[in-house]
């Protein structure tokens, strides 16, 4: 038993020792393997790093070589440029030297020629002096006296030639200007077509039956008095069947009265309170219609940027007239004529059209200041920030201020064309006859005038002068003086042509 135990203990001890030895041997082997692997990996890393460093070195070397090559190339190019420049400078230097040599040769040649010329000049002066002495001896005049006589004769000849030349130029300019002006005016008129509108100072309001007249008059005339007080229009109710006459010089008031009457008659309620209500409503409608008319007019004409108050004034032109011609129609016609004429003359047609539309705005305000309508219109345009050339065209279209823009004469001419065309305006017969008589009497006031005739509705004045009192040259100045006096002292539409006629008659009798 004990032996068995001892054997077991010995076996255990031997087994433990063997196990320990085997364990130590295994650890050493594994350590050796790890060391070998580490050494191998270190060798690989070392080789990789060496390769990487070598690659970087080679790349850096290649980059440096490229940079050096590029710099060498630039240096070579710079050297080539310097060589070329040096070559060019050498060539230029040679050229300068050559030209300097040529210049010196030319200078020497010129100096030699100057010496020759000076000698010849001295000889010529001597010859001239000898010839002058001979001429003075032959003519009996000194050189200064002969020179003065020659200059005087040349002056007279030059004056005669200049006068003839000026007359030719003036005749040609008059002929050309006349033809061109006629062409432009005719073309402008042909390209503008407008209606003829004749306004009256009365409006006839038609009613269905005469029974309505009594309702309009009201008890003891209270309705008609209320209507007249509200509108400012005289209402004439007479025996004219189915008609009531509205009389007022202000077309806006007449239009308000007409529309108010139409609404009252249609509604059937006619009494003072209702009349005031309807008139106030209609007045507002008419004001809106005025603004709408102004806007529509500017849109039709292609005019933009006008002040709202100017648009209102343009709309109000619809209810104004001048010598029976509707003012808005006249303004539109003048605007279109201005645009056409400005285009023909190479000016801005839009600005000309704007000036033509606004030229009569001074006739619109209800108050009547002391200023003429052209100057008042100019002040209104300036107030609402219109450009200076537009304002000048408005103010100068009746020569009441100096024309400082090219638009002014265009507006003046187109205004005259629009107002002077047949059927455009209507004048009172007495005023028409008086104007003709005034024209004839004005011309008769000049000495030497024997007869005068106003023809073509006062657009031409023929003046007969005595041949023994006025010569041909004086006829031209007389026509100019008469034209200026008519322009300064008279008011007339369009233009007046003055023709002075001088006739010489020789009468003999054979017996």
Curated annotation (Swiss-Prot):
The keyword Coiled coil does not apply. GO terms for cellular component: plasma membrane. Keywords: Cell membrane, Endonuclease, Hydrolase, Membrane, Nuclease, RNA-binding, Transmembrane, Transmembrane helix. It is a single-pass membrane protein. SMART domains: HDc, KH. Residues 327-420 form the HD domain. Endoribonuclease that initiates mRNA decay. It holds the Pfam family HD. The chain crosses the membrane at residues 2-22. Residues 201-261 form the KH domain. Belongs to the RNase Y family. SUPFAM superfamilies: Eukaryotic type KH-domain (KH-domain type I) (SSF54791), HD-domain/PDEase-like (SSF109604). PROSITE patterns: HD, KH_TYPE_1. It comes from Phocaeicola vulgatus (strain ATCC 8482 / DSM 1447 / JCM 5826 / CCUG 4940 / NBRC 14291 / NCTC 11154) (Bacteroides vulgatus). It is found in: Cell membrane. This is Ribonuclease Y. InterPro entries: HD/PDEase_dom, HD_domain, HDIG_dom, KH_dom, KH_dom_type_1, KH_dom_type_1_sf, Ribonuclease_Y, RNase_Y_N. Its EC number is 3.1.-.-. One of its GO terms (molecular function) is RNA endonuclease activity. The keyword Secreted does not apply.
